[in-house]
């Protein structure tokens, strides 16, 4: 059966470790894996604009010996004049894998149903699993482990980053806290899934409206923009609602003294995070951004290897 990566929990805890171990290896020896030599082509499709996702996937695919085919919104008929399943059947005849940054998660699921090559979710409205892999790689670099650590997310608990922090964090054995106001809490489906995983890994889940409760003793502090793509018309309302959830010096005072700060970027200083935090010594956001490259290379290498094993 073809392996895909649409959600963080598409990797078991042991598989997540395999990918993160490989990511560390590829960071040390950038060109040691060449699974796309030929070169084979990987389509990288964007329905949403991107900087880090395009940079990291295009560079990573080239590092792996492949050819990145960048398809921007409006440059193809994906999802327009034929079913995604039909498009997928054509794509699998020419490509080694498909990477898609899109809106509705259901589109990814439909694409998967029609293809026998790996599909990677480069971001959907539901989750952002490639980012969380990079986050976990960064945590391992700075803390030496993930299991038993507390990771606290502040802000829009219904966002894709909050959902992926939940799923990816508990898969890694972390205690995950989400601090969010009423009306912006995580989708109950993701909370239930995360709790089920945590019961097996020793992690835990806490959803709270109290940012102080989430910050207390935390090892990893995470936030994201308050105004995601597609939410621009809610900007004023969101800034007012999330004001108490800004990450600032007070947040760090409550956290563990050795806590690190993560943000997937772009960041808006003075809104979700203060300049004191993101530009300070506890911020690891630039390492985190670089690790998108290494984590995604490891993921693609792992998926291609698994699918070749299954084909034998």
Curated annotation (Swiss-Prot):
Pfam families registered for this protein in UniProt: OTCace, OTCace_N
UniProt pathway: Amino-acid biosynthesis; L-arginine biosynthesis; L-arginine from L-ornithine and carbamoyl phosphate: step 1/3
UniProt KW keywords: Amino-acid biosynthesis, Arginine biosynthesis, Cytoplasm, Transferase
Xref: PROSITE patterns: CARBAMOYLTRANSFERASE
Keyword Nucleus: no
Gene Ontology biological process terms from the UniProt entry: arginine biosynthetic process via ornithine; citrulline biosynthetic process; L-arginine biosynthetic process
GO cellular-component term (any): cytoplasm
Recorded catalytic activity of this chain's protein: carbamoyl phosphate + L-ornithine = L-citrulline + phosphate + H(+)
Cellular location(s): Cytoplasm
Entry's Gene Ontology molecular function annotations: amino acid binding; ornithine carbamoyltransferase activity
InterPro entries for the chain: Asp/Orn_carbamoyltranf_P-bd, Asp/Orn_carbamoylTrfase, Asp/Orn_carbamoylTrfase_sf, Asp_carbamoyltransf_Asp/Orn-bd, Orn/put_carbamltrans, OTCase_ArgI
SS bond partners: none
E.C. number(s) listed in UniProt: 2.1.3.3
Residue positions binding carbamoyl phosphate: 50-53, 77, 101, 128-131, 264-265, 292
Residues involved in L-ornithine binding: 160, 224, 228-229
Presence of the UniProt keyword Transferase in the record: yes
UniProt cross-references to PANTHER family, sorted A to Z: ORNITHINE CARBAMOYLTRANSFERASE, MITOCHONDRIAL, ORNITHINE TRANSCARBAMYLASE, MITOCHONDRIAL
Family: Belongs to the aspartate/ornithine carbamoyltransferase superfamily. OTCase family.
Function: Reversibly catalyzes the transfer of the carbamoyl group from carbamoyl phosphate (CP) to the N(epsilon) atom of ornithine (ORN) to produce L-citrulline.
Record-given protein name: Ornithine carbamoyltransferase
Organism: Leifsonia xyli subsp. xyli (strain CTCB07)
Taxon lineage: Bacteria, Bacillati, Actinomycetota, Actinomycetes, Micrococcales
